[in-house]
Amino acid sequence: MSLVEAVAMESKQLSVQTRGFQPRAFGVLAEAFRHGDVAILSGAGLSTESGIPDYRGPSGQARRTGQPMTYQEFTGSTGARQRYWARSHLGWRHVTGAAPNAGHRGVAALERAGLVSGIITQNVDGLHQAAGAASVTELHGSLHRVVCLSCWSRSSREELDARLRAANPAWTAAGAEPAVNPDGDVALEETSGFTVVNCVSCGGLLKPDVVFFGENVPKPRVEACFSLVASSSGLVVLGSSLTVMSGLRYVRRASSLGIPVVIVNQGTTRGDALATATLDAPLGETLTAVVRELGLADSRQDGSLSLERDGFGAGTHRVALPRRLDEAVVVGDGDRV
């Protein structure tokens, strides 16, 4: 039986709405991975269980505190850069304090078992790698690196953090602990007293090595991800609303090639109508269940699998056949984030 047939069969045997954990509710996902050679596209929803918020909740409504910095703002305004680095400096300790969750460990276990052809992540937190995953393409870059916009040299964020602390010994945020956003910065009003540092090699402007809103994803990276999807037997989307074209285009490409797409997300996504099957469920417990179903160990150092600790239990899970989205949110021109 082909992967397309197997996924379709599992999907058709599921009710559209189930409450509480249903073993068959993740059968379609387990079946997809059982065939192997599956590409994974992950989004912010995979990291929420690690304490890093996503841009949109289950309702699909944006819930970021403040507007994200655009590339044009960052490069065109000294004040904008000062504001960004002050906020990001505070948010950085939150990012470095985050640990991989059951979802990340499940993905690493599936990859280690040879069932994953590659991982494309829209996240910039590095948690896939921290969980032990190896074949990871960071579509939007990484907060753990910094790039100079003049000489293009790259350095670690840890090094920059030390320089920022040295340059701002008396700088503190007033008030309560600020809310952290998905891109690692925080909501902070007063930033005028913050000192920004430049490249140690040439004195140029430093930027986190991530793709800002309004900035292009590097073409070689885009094409490498297209090649991965085209050469895989299936595409599984984990925790992405697919609101922006940078992720949606891979679902569209897989669909156009007849490659089955399974989407696991809490809430609807922009790609649901193209999916072979969709599953509305928490990522951690779902991937834990899949790993157990396939007889694998997760990527913890002791190889154990703790369902109770990772919240495996009650919840609401919805698996549905492909459906049309009544409202599609169009973002970007197809080439941008």
Kindly give the residue locations of the regions a language model identified.
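Conserved catalytic core of sirtuin-type NAD+-dependent deacylases
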Residues: 1-337
